[in-house]
Amino acid sequence: MKIQIKKFKKIDDVTVVLQPLNIFIGANNSGKSSFIQGIQFAISGCQTLKLKGGIWTGKGTKTLSLDSSEYLYTPTSNIEYLYHGKRLIGSRRREDRSWIEFILSDEKTSSLKISRGKNGGFTTSLDGRDLGDELSDIDNPYC
């Protein structure tokens, strides 16, 4: 499994290819815990989209606007403070928004992106239906 995390907490952009056993070593505040929290937050985001009734489009995308309190797991009570180096702020135009992004690949690829929506919620978008369905499965959590 390859995991890429962009703009999450202490992490600007990192890609890690996971092995059966992984050991993270680094100085305090270098992003070790942020990486682990990022994986948990990404899976939680996928599961939340499923629980809240997100529906796959024909293009293989599922998108909902959610409040911080609606996510199954967040490392902090307000998602806007999870953006790398500053608060996550929105924009009326989707192409101008800042995004927290998680890309997971294991023969199939799926990405979860979170931005501040124009109405104050958090636009949560999952691309890649094949792996996305596995990541969203609450009864058999992805491990």
What are these model-derived regions, one by one?
Residues 1-143:
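P-loop NTPase switch/coupling surface
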